[in-house]
């Protein structure tokens, strides 16, 4: 058995329903798996982490077999996360744990890995967001079995759960592209591809996937112009927006609302909802075209307010503006309007208006994360 002496990364990649072959959901699943391996390898090579324990299905196991920096645990059909975590801790005698989501941590640097390692060893628990976290580091010896057993099944809630149930000293990860950038949508992959020149396993995958057809150039051109103005809408962290704004010449007009939507599950109130009700959609889209030269929208709020029941595949198709294949009537209508817009508009979720915009602003500033840079991270 592996002797765990450092920080042990753990990830659960749990797809309860296998995506339909050829779907956007399938492409996202496969791309996230490549990201897991790239990120796990970089953590292991940094010298601050042990092998990553990956908990997943048989398909992921086949990909992981030949890798010396991962240990694979086959997932159970119905998983209770807390029960499974305690089982893994006891099986491998783990103490210092770094749990990360598949789409996170890709741009964390070696210095940031060092920061996580040193402060976790000091007894602090760390995450990139106290409310909805993408990664979290803690010592299992500081927790009772009862606390571990009752971990929420949704990993974004881990940080807020520990803050509410324990007296552990919390340390928020400093804001950077590495701590903010997370991949949940097709446009996140397109942005990753753009700023890395398709480095690593994930870059190779994207360059041969449906994501390679996503055009970001028109929007990047708008970001690069002093005379341009963009509209950013969604669950925007003001600090992330400030850091992006420092890098880009264009002006930013933004509306930030509904942060915490994922935890609540439904949009509660919305200024945009008021605008949509007071103006018809045609007038509102014309307004966007008149007041700005480009946009980047977190559509999950809009769909929560107006779309009713919908499949995740419809959301991904909307992100890629493939409105013809969308089943939900509202999402189809909305996406068609965006696709026909005279200005370039990027669609996505929380990640695209935070880490995505920050990454594009770095690109405009001239900072590329090519293979030579990635090798130093």
What are these regions (language model features)?
Residues 1-21:
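N-terminal nucleotide-binding beta1-loop-alpha1 segment
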Residues 153-377:
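Conserved alpha/beta core of the MobA/IspD/sugar-nucleotide pyrophosphorylase nucleotidyltransferase superfamily
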Residues 48-58:
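Short beta-strand/loop segment that forms part of the nucleotide-sugar
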Residues 60-97, 106, 331:
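Short phosphate-binding loop-to-helix
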Residues 125, 140-165:
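Short, glycine-/small-residue-rich phosphate/pyrophosphate-handling segment
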Residues 32-49:
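A short, N-terminal amphipathic alpha-helix
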Residues 105-132:
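Conserved donor-nucleotide/metal-binding helix-loop-beta segment in metal-dependent transferases, i.e.
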